[in-house]
Amino acid sequence: MPTKRFDKKHWKMVVVLLAICGAMLLLRWAAMIWG
C-alpha cells in the first residue's frame, strides 16, 4: 500500500508534468500566433 509520503511525492510529480505540458502548449500557441 502506498504511504502518504509516496502520495505527496506522486502528486508533486503529476503537478510538475502538468506544468511542463502546459508550458509546451503555450509555447506552441505563441509560435503559431507569431509565426
Curated annotation (Swiss-Prot):
InterPro entries tied to this protein: YniD-like (IPR048084)
Principal subcellular localisation of the protein: membrane
Signal peptide: none
Record's subcellular location: Membrane
UniProt KW Transmembrane keyword: yes
Keyword tags: Membrane, Stress response, Transmembrane, Transmembrane helix
Coiled coil: none
Topology class, membrane: Single-pass membrane protein
Gene Ontology CC annotations of this record: membrane
Record-annotated membrane-spanning stretches: 14-34
Induction of expression: Constitutively expressed (at protein level).
Protein name: Uncharacterized protein YniD
Originating organism: Escherichia coli (strain K12)
